[in-house]
Amino acid sequence: MPGHNTSRNSSCDPIVTPHLISLYFIVLIGGLVGVISILFLLVKMNTRSVTTMAVINLVVVHSVFLLTVPFRLTYLIKKTWMFGLPFCKFVSAMLHIHMYLTFLFYVVILVTRYLIFFKCKDKVEFYRKLHAVAASAGMWTLVIVIVVPLVVSRYGIHEEYNEEHCFKFHKELAYTYVKIINYMIVIFVIAVAVILLVFQVFIIMLMVQKLRHSLLSHQEFWAQLKNLFFIGVILVCFLPYQFFRIYYLNVVTHSNACNSKVAFYNEIFLSVTAISCYDLLLFVFGGSHWFKQKIIGLWNCVLCR
C-alpha cells in the first residue's frame, strides 16, 4: 500500500519549472530589502497607532515566512525534500498562513484609514503603548499556540505521503469538510476584497470632487493613495489564486485522475501570493519625497490638459 501511494504521488507531481526558483529568489531578496527598509521608517512612526502596529505585524509575518523560503528553494533545486515530513507540512502551511495573515493586516490598515476618513479623525490609536503591545502579543499567541499547531497537526493526515516529496497534499481536498472550508475561505476573501475596493474607489472619488485643485496638499490624500498599494497587492497577488482555487477545487474533488497541469498552475498562483512581501518596499516608496513629486507633476499635467 505505501508503495502504491508513492508511485501515485510521483505521477501526480506538478510540472517542475525553473520559474518557481526564480520567483522565490526574487521574493526572498525583495522581502529582505523591504523588511530592512521599513525598520528605519518604523523608528519615526507612532507606535500607538493601529496602522503602525499592523505594519509592525506585517514585518513579523513576512520575516517568519522568509525564513522558510530557503527550504523551498533547496527542494526546488535538488528535487528532494531532506527535512522530514512534519517540517514539510509546516513550510507548506506557512505559505497559506502568510497569505491570510497578510490579508488580515491589510484589512486592519484599510478599515482603520476608512474610519479616519468617514469620522474625520486625525488618527486611530491605542490609549497606551502597552495596549498596542498586548493586542499584538495576544494575536500572535493565538496564532502560535492554536492556529499553527492545529494546521500542522491536521494538514495531510488522511493519506500516506512520500517524505522525499513535499507540497503535494492535494488529495486532502477530496474530503467534503476540507472542500467546504476551502470554498468558505475563498468566498470570504473575494467578498472582503471587493468591498474594500468599492470603498476605496468611493473615497478617492469623493476627495477628487471635493478637493480637486488642492488635492495634493492634503495629507489624507496621500494616506488614501497608499491604500491603493495594499488594494493592488490584494488584486494582483491574492485574488488570482482565490479565483483559480474555485476551479482547482472542482477539478481535484471531481476527478480521480491526476491533472499535472492544473496542479502546476495552482502552484504558480499560490507562489505569486508570496510576492506580497514587496508591500513593505511599496510602503516605504509611497512615503518618499521623490514619489510625491512625481505624482504632483503627473497631476499638474492632467489639470493642464
UniProtKB/Swiss-Prot annotation:
TM segment ranges: 23-43, 51-71, 90-110, 132-152, 184-204, 228-248, 268-288
PROSITE patterns registered for this protein in UniProt: G_PROTEIN_RECEP_F1_2
Pfam families in the record: 7tm_1 (PF00001)
GO cellular component: plasma membrane
Keyword vocabulary terms for this entry: Cell membrane, G-protein coupled receptor, Glycoprotein, Membrane, Receptor, Transducer, Transmembrane, Transmembrane helix
SS bonds (residue pairs): none
Residues carrying sugar: N5, N9
Membrane topology, as annotated: Multi-pass membrane protein
Subcellular localization(s) per the UniProt record: Cell membrane
Topological domains annotated Extracellular: 1-22, 72-89, 153-183, 249-267
Keyword Glycoprotein applies: yes
Cytoplasmic side: 44-50, 111-131, 205-227, 289-305
GO biological processes: inflammatory response
Keyword Nucleus annotated: no
GO molecular function, one term: G protein-coupled receptor activity
Homology family: Belongs to the G-protein coupled receptor 1 family.
Protein's job: Orphan receptor.
Designated name of the protein: Probable G-protein coupled receptor 141
Protein source organism: Homo sapiens (Human)
